Amino acid sequence: MDKLQRDGKEDTSRQRRFLYPLLFQEDFYTIAYDHCSNRSSSFEPMGNSSSNDRFSFLTVKRSISRIRQQNGSIVPFVNCDQNKLVGHNKSFYSELVLGGLTAVSEVPFSIRSKHSLEGMNEWASFRSINSIFPLMEDKIPHSNFILDIRIPHLTHPEILVRTFRRWIQDAPFLHSLRSVLHEHRNLIISSNLDQLILIASKKNTRLSLFLWNYYAYECESLLVPLWKRFSHSRSLPYESFIERTPFYRKIEHIVIFYHKYLKKSLWFLKDPSIHYVKYRERSIIALRGTYLLVKKWRYHLTNFWQCHFHLWLQPYRIYIDELSNNCFSFLGYLLSVKMKTSVVRIKMLDDSFITDLITKEFDPIAPTTLLIGSLVKEKFCDISGHPFSRLAWTGLTDDDILDRFDRIWRNIFHYHSGSSKKDGLYRMKYILRLPCAKTLACKHKSAIRAVRERFGSELFTKSFPKERESIFLSFSKTRSQRERIWYSDIIQRNPFVNS
């Protein structure tokens, strides 16, 4: 890989045109087998692995020689008769070839990403998911509409091959990739991203996730020049003017006056206010303008993807939400913008008067109903909140049972600490106490009342570490109940969050 990177710096076209010979190198299949063995160990027990599936360089050499004997084609090798594969089954060879193809496909893109991220170590500080919300808290209140885009997952193999042509110019490699994609269509066609990840874990290959991530990257990469055009237009900061409507009128008259009488070229006031956020299969575009402008944006985005990617994106996959009337779900929160009225006393030279100042405020709320539904899905309770005991945990010690329930509650509260209303979170804590007590009662074959009398207040006593509890108490004393705390050490989504 280091040699390829050095060659890539000298001649970037070399890494695009000579990928096919890499399919006949033993090292890439060793790397592929490493990935397969590591991923399989996390999903399947070791007892299920067959002794015939052990890796050896002799097997790889025989496989490569068999590929060469079949005129350099990979697909006949993948689809060959199982009786011809002495000592190994067909799935082993198929996974080995798919893994090698994935390793070779990642070569130009890994080099490209490494070059683009050189000298950008500060990106490591933005790994937290919750870093998205402070950005949205600053930008979304100044927007009127939200375009909620669901990236499609039903992708034709030929579209992926055409997308690869933008960066890979090796025709034999593209033909091999096309044949493999047409043969393994189930790796790239799924209803949602979670199902795609499940398929990838069962099939023991990274090809499906690599193809989807690359396709999603290409779909949004061409939108960056559009955002840059709007960013070059002059705009004024929001903090400078409380009431922007009269200011717009004054600027309009000034521009007309200077244009008529002074005949000078002036900068017009432009305020596009376009903000883009993406996580997994969802993209959020916040816009400031009228409903007609937002519909035009949806129309242009749909046509743009159809022309450049042959992607027939249905309009219903781009939702339009008006922030003043509706809320939208994103990363486990119900996000909305509410109007906040403040009483302001204005003092002038001879007089003073009181007026109302209306401002917009970002209002994230933890959806209690969805969180309870997640507990129902994990069989902690029913839809009415009636608790279920975890019979599979009765073989653990009391401390382990308490730690598991405590960890669930701590993760939920830690993730949703930015909610403006904490009542629903404390309700979740109360609901989780009941399955915990019932599990302990089943273990000791006693009543729930006896468990509560025995453990007392020790249930969920570890929900906060001491330093975090002191920080939270200090915030609660100095600030109101609606203050939000965004923890920056969250790098993955809460498993109980479904939206």
UniProtKB/Swiss-Prot annotation:
Pfam families: Intron_maturas2, MatK_N. Its main location: plastid. It is found in: Plastid, Chloroplast. InterPro entries: Domain_X, Maturase_MatK, Maturase_MatK_N. It comes from the Eukaryota. GO terms for molecular function: RNA binding. GO terms for cellular component: chloroplast. Keywords: Chloroplast, mRNA processing, Plastid, RNA-binding, tRNA processing. GO terms for biological process: mRNA processing; RNA splicing; tRNA processing. PANTHER family: MATURASE K. Belongs to the intron maturase 2 family. MatK subfamily. Usually encoded in the trnK tRNA gene intron. Probably assists in splicing its own and other chloroplast group II introns. This is Maturase K. It comes from Macrozamia communis (Burrawang palm).
